[in-house]
Amino acid sequence: MRFDAADAHWRETPRPGASSAQKDWLTRGGSLTAHLARLGRVTVRVTRETVAAPWADEHRALSCASRAPVWVREVVLAVDGAPFVAAHSIAPLAASKGVWQAMRRLRTRPLAELLYSDPEVTRSALVSRRVLAGHPLFSLASLALARAYATEHAFAARRSVFERRGTPLMVTECMLPALWRHLDAHGERRARGLEQT
């Protein structure tokens, strides 16, 4: 793996003030969608798919120029209707028409369908950070909440780079307050009354 999402802010070890649940979910390997599915029914809402420039803290992880065009896919992963994760995925524009072209056709299917079903795909280490106002991920998470939590001052997020045939695709996942509330109330179980659905 020649790509790495780590930098001065994104680190492999979660920040010291993170809760045990945050440390677990920020470092948990495998498909985040599959982990969420154990908590309830997962739905994917696509909020944006477009060509854009990478964020300031993204281009180095992809080994591309700071203004090189990338394909962006942003979604909200909801569990039983509550937004649990805001996700932002990017790939070099050329790759989104080549090696990673399937990401353009996912619609409301999770990206995990591509990433965990192909033996050619490898993954970098997971890195995480606390996201504050001013970072574009903070705005993305705030929009996902539809102003339901206007007082939220920070979010916990993680990211990693997937590689296929030498070409990167980076996934950044921002955990939303409803996830932590569910884990506080129910642990890794489905909410009461939803076990049979």
UniProtKB/Swiss-Prot annotation:
Major subcellular location class: cytoplasm
Compartments (UniProt record): Cytoplasm
Functional pathway: Cofactor biosynthesis; ubiquinone biosynthesis
InterPro entries: Chorismate--pyruvate_lyase (IPR007440), Chorismate_lyase_/UTRA_dom_sf (IPR028978)
Binding site for substrate: 73, 111, 173
One GO MF term: chorismate lyase activity
SUPFAM superfamilies: Chorismate lyase-like
Catalytic activity of the protein: chorismate = 4-hydroxybenzoate + pyruvate
GO cellular component, one term: cytosol
Annotated stretches, region: Disordered: 1-23
Key words of the record: Cytoplasm, Lyase, Pyruvate, Ubiquinone biosynthesis
EC number: 4.1.3.40
Biased composition annotated in UniProt, kind: Basic and acidic residues: 1-14
EC main group: lyase
GO biological process terms on file: pyruvate biosynthetic process; ubiquinone biosynthetic process
UniProt family annotation: Belongs to the UbiC family.
Protein role: Removes the pyruvyl group from chorismate, with concomitant aromatization of the ring, to provide 4-hydroxybenzoate (4HB) for the ubiquinone pathway.
Protein name: Probable chorismate pyruvate-lyase
Lineage: Bacteria, Pseudomonadati, Pseudomonadota, Betaproteobacteria, Burkholderiales
Gene encoding the protein: ubiC
